[in-house]
């Protein structure tokens, strides 16, 4: 079993929704809802986001970290980085040290986010 990033009990019962994305800061905020609730229970913040793949709403907040090789493959496949980076071990190491592939499996698809970090927030700043 893979380790859950946020360690939320009954994580598959929660619903996620994209709340805001700030391209200048590369920050992605997600609203997380308990079953049958219309107000968010909490938020998730992904920082230094390079990639997001998924619908704007989905079931499950059971995020886990994918393999660093899968993260690098996705960065190469999408053209975010070029294959030349593989010729420079220091650059390759920096990417694999800072970029993480966050995954969540839903009943219908797999959500993929490449970011440097993720945090759970009780509230979000009022000015966003």
Each predicted region: which residue ranges?
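Surface-exposed, interaction-prone regions used to assemble/regulate multi-protein complexes
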Residues: 1-128
């Amino acid at each position: 079993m893979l380790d859950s990033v946020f360690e939320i009990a009954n994580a598959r019962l929660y619903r996620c929704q994209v709340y805001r994305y700030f391209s200048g800061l590369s920050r992605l905020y997600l609203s997380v809802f308990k079953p049958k609730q219309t107000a968010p229970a909490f938020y998730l913040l992904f920082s230094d986001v390079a990639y997001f793949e998924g619908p704007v709403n989905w079931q499950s907040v059971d995020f886990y970290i994918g393999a660093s090789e899968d993260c690098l493959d996705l960065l190469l496949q999408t053209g975010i980085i070029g294959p030349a980076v593989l010729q420079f071990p220091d650059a390759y190491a920096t990417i694999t040290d800072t970029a993480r592939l966050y995954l969540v499996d839903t009943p219908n698809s797999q959500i993929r986010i490449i970011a440097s970090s993720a945090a759970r927030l009780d509230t979000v700043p009022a000015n966003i």
